[in-house]
């Protein structure tokens, strides 16, 4: 999309026609988060970038903001992000943050470690931050940041990729999944934990099956549905609109 105010525009999904301010041109059953190209934001254009994002955040399908530290060599609490955090607070939408491993070797893990979320969470206590991928493989650190900060939640997307057979998956990833289970129990608050897929990198039915074996059954309804509807607060109206 083209810039209207001279700032950096969001990275958008490409499932529909180009963005239009009147109709937004999004499929009726799709919600999305605006992607942030942090390296393109400067002190000079940070406020203008927030204005660009505000155009999109008014879209009923826009559920939040997504940062990509690690892929961008910018820490979560860098001041260039602050106007976006203020925008998230004003519109009551969460800020999701890529954490943990990166998909290619050029990514820099010091920026994507889940401990980096702590500083932003303390500086902006009225903004909800979502640690995407549970900080994989740093589950302990992600759980501690979420445990310490009332405004931090976790999603379980993209932990295992591909399409292995279920029993092979459990056998191959037994220790990995045991650690995940241990640290989710350490957090102890399953209202802070959300299912996520990272589609198309995962087989959705298999991934649901895997997460259902990690999360105690009594919390399935919260982890697979209720928490996302509460944390991404615009989902409810979107579901009503779609008849869901």
Task: Kindly give the residue locations of the regions a language model identified.
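Mid-to-C-terminal alpha-helical segments outside catalytic/metal-binding sites
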Residues: 1, 181-182, 186-194, 201-244
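Active-site environment of divalent metal-dependent phosphoester hydrolases
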Residues: 3-4, 39-41, 72, 101-105, ...
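Active-site gating/metal-coordination segments in enzymes
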Residues: 6-111
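Active-site phosphate/pyrophosphate- and oxyanion-stabilizing loops and adjacent acidic/basic residues
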Residues: 13, 20, 54, 118-119, ...
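Short, conserved catalytic or adaptor-binding loops enriched in Gly and charged residues
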Residues: 19-25, 145, 183-187, 215
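A generic structural motif
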Residues: 34, 72, 157-159, 221-229
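Short, surface-exposed amphipathic charged segments that create phosphate/polyanion-binding patches used
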Residues: 46-55, 168-171, 235-240
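Catalytic pocket-lining loop regions of alpha/beta-barrel enzymes
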Residues: 62-64, 77-194, 242
């Amino acid at each position: 999309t083209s810039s209207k105010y001279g700032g950096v525009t969001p990275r958008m999904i490409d499932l529909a026609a180009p963005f239009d301010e009147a109709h937004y041109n999004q499929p009726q059953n799709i919600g999305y988060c605006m992607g942030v190209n942090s390296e393109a934001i400067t002190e000079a254009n940070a406020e203008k970038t927030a204005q660009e994002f505000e155009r999109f955040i008014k879209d009923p399908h826009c559920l939040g903001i997504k940062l990509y530290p690690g892929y961008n060599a910018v820490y979560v609490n860098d001041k260039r992000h602050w106007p976006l955090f203020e925008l998230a607070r004003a519109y009551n939408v969460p800020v999701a943050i890529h954490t943990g491993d990166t998909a290619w070797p050029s990514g820099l893990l010091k920026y994507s470690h889940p401990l980096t979320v702590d500083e932003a969470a303390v500086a902006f206590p009225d903004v909800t931050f979502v640690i995407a991928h549970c900080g994989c493989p740093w589950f302990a650190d992600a759980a501690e940041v979420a445990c310490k900060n009332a405004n931090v939640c976790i999603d379980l997307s993209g932990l295992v990729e591909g399409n292995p057979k279920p029993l092979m998956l459990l056998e191959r990833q037994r220790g990995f999944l045991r650690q995940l289970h241990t640290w989710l129990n350490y957090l102890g608050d399953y209202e802070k934990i959300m299912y996520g897929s990272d589609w198309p990198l995962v087989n959705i039915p298999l991934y649901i099956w895997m997460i259902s074996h990690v999360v105690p059954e009594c919390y399935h309804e919260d982890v697979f549905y209720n928490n996302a509807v509460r944390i991404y607060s615009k989902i409810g109206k979107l579901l009503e609109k779609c008849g869901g």
